[in-house]
Design a protein with these regions (language model features):
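Positively charged n-region of N-terminal signal peptides that target proteins for export
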Residues: 1-5
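Core nucleotidyl-transferase/polymerase catalytic module
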Residues: 179-188, 200-202, 206-208, 222-237, ...
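N-terminal capping segments
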Residues: 25-204, 368
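Low-complexity, Gly/Ser/Thr/Pro-rich intrinsically disordered linker/tail segments
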Residues: 306, 311-369
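...with weaker cross-activation on analogous glycine-rich loops/strands in unrelated enzymes
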Residues: 209-313
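Bacterial N-terminal signal peptides
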Residues: 7-17
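Boundary at the C-terminal end of the N-terminal hydrophobic targeting segment
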Residues: 20-24
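Short, solvent-exposed loop/turn and secondary-structure capping segments
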Residues: 67-69, 205-207, 263-267, 318-321
């Protein structure tokens, strides 16, 4: 569909309710959206938003996750995704095994167990020739679906191994799953698993997916409907973090297409929120690498907001972000000596990647009331 200028609410409503895309958003519409977002921000969080907060905190505690302070540095190194248990005697519950916890997020995302096909997005990455005595100078990465590997292992005839056959099969299956947890990003699976616990309806309220961009796009579509008084179906709308105060249950999101990465995002205009909002509203796909954290605490007195996200430094991590004097997300995050940490950006000697809080925060997903 060709780009469309908003000319009247009725025409816009017809476009939005039909699920079409390709519309442009003018500055007046952004001002209207800002007012709606600010109005909702002044209302206390709903019971479901509180449940989202409680579940995120519970998962952080269960994972024994990491913590990042307001300077953007890790102050507590929690368990990592591929770790085994930390008990000396090796007798633990499944909740004490970090990689099993991370697998649980995938199972909740897909609403079924790994044995029932929950690992559709999980892959094992491998490099043919990497174990050769004289490996090639350049190794090419290949991927294998976890479900295919698990099916193969299940079909192996291990009867010749005697009483060890069951243990051998279990060890092979767990090794495959454990390596896939390290190979495939699970931050969006973590967020989706939190929403399952509420639960949010997957047909209307939340787009469960292994990619953050999917539910960010759904929130933008809801904001467009809100502009014309359309139906409020999605639990989240997209708001500008520069003009909207956070509440518990909201999500702060950033993108990782920055200068120095293979695919930087070329911002159009002074506002990152408006630039990406417009691009996505027009049906474009300007970003693919993004991350969202769940707001679990807002402390106006100390001008701090605490968020929790999955797969942050390979853990479930709690971060403390700065708010400005107006209670909005501050442009000043962490230690200015450090460049923002970005896995897609190579480290330079002059700018060590050591600040986990200084990111391209571009949207606040605001929870419904």
């Amino acid at each position: 569909m060709l780009p469309l200028r908003i000319v009247c609410p009725l025409a816009m409503l017809m476009i939005l309710t039909s699920g079409a895309s390709g519309q442009e958003v003018d500055d007046a519409s952004f001002r209207n959206l800002a007012k709606q977002c600010q109005m909702r921000a002044s209302v206390a969080a709903s019971s479901r938003a509180i449940k989202i907060k409680d579940e995120a905190i519970a998962q952080h505690q269960a994972f024994n996750g990491s913590r990042v302070d307001r300077t953007g540095r890790i102050v507590f190194f929690g368990h990592s995704e591929a770790e085994s248990d930390q008990e000396l005697d090796g007798n633990v519950s499944a909740r004490q095994i970090p990689w099993r916890q991370a697998l649980g997020y995938w199972e909740k995302l897909n609403d079924r167990k790994i044995g029932e096909g929950a690992g559709g997005a999980l892959q094992v990455w491998y490099y043919p020739g990497a174990l050769d005595d004289d490996p090639p100078s350049i190794l090419h990465r290949k991927k294998m679906q976890v479900q295919r590997l698990l099916k193969f292992i299940s079909g192996l005839d291990l009867s010749q191994m005697g009483p060890e056959s069951d243990d051998l099969r279990e060890a092979l299956q767990q090794s495959v799953i454990r390596s896939s947890i390290s190979d495939v990003a699970w931050s969006a699976a973590f967020v989706s698993s939190i929403m399952r616990a509420v639960p949010l309806d997957e047909k209307t309220e939340f787009s469960y997916d292994a990619s953050h961009v999917t539910y960010i796009t759904s929130a933008i579509e809801q904001s467009l409907r809100d502009l014309v008084g359309g139906e409020s179906t999605s639990f989240y709308r997209a708001c500008d973090p520069d003009t909207t105060k956070p509440r518990i249950g909201d999500l702060f999101c950033y993108h990782r297409h920055i200068e120095g990465t293979p695919h930087p995002y070329a911002q159009k205009g002074p506002s990152l929120f408006k630039s990406l909002f417009r691009d996505i509203a027009k049906g474009e796909e300007p970003i693919s690498h993004s991350h969202c954290d769940i707001v679990v605490r807002v402390d106006s007195d100390s001008s701090k907001v605490t968020v929790i996200g999955g797969n942050v430094q390979n853990s479930v991590t709690e971060k403390v972000l700065n708010l400005n004097e107006r209670g909005l997300l501050s442009a000043a995050q962490g230690n200015t000596v450090c460049d923002s940490y970005n896995t897609d950006k190579p480290t330079s000697p002059g700018e060590p990647n050591c600040n986990l809080n200084r990111q391209k925060w571009f949207v606040l997903l605001q929870a419904a009331i």
